[in-house]
Amino acid sequence: MNYLLPLFSVLLGYGIALFLKPKSKTKLKLLLAFSGSFLLSLTVMHLLPEVYESHNTNIGLFIMAGILFQIILEFFSKGAEHGHVHGHETMSHIPWLLFVSLCIHAFLEGFPVSHHHNLALGIAIHHLPIAIILTMFFINAQLDKKAIFFFMITFAVMTPLGTILSDYLPILNNYYNEITAVVIGILFHISSTIIFES
């Protein structure tokens, strides 16, 4: 049931932005900063010690690969993973590069959740302000409401999908430490960026 927290979090953020239309950017930034700090503490206190217990000498390389991978994803998403969206132009269609990079990011975040149920809460707290900010951005860009719903529901499903795949594909368990190290790199980059930008 914990793996559904990120899904409900995105849907809650979508609903808040759609119906309540929050105006205070300061409160959103504070929520974003809290989510980044919470994610960083979960990563350092839970994920990092576990991957280093495996005594795999290449774990650091996988963490660096995760950081590099996130930098590449941000090139396409323009930093939307950490609430960084710009622009007031009108959109007639879904920004596909943003969509694909956010879905890959959310999907990979789901892998360690099956072994660390408290990480689901951290990801949910991280996804809530992102969902609010993205939905408000799309509404302001006058993107079609069906397209916004499709974008947000797909984004919401990605993290639980990553968790389910890691549970039901035993071959992935052979590479659990390596995959988790890549996710640690991704989470390090995102949480530190959120903290420094807030």
Where are each of the predicted segments found?
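Intrinsically disordered, metal-sensing/regulatory segments
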Residues: 1-198
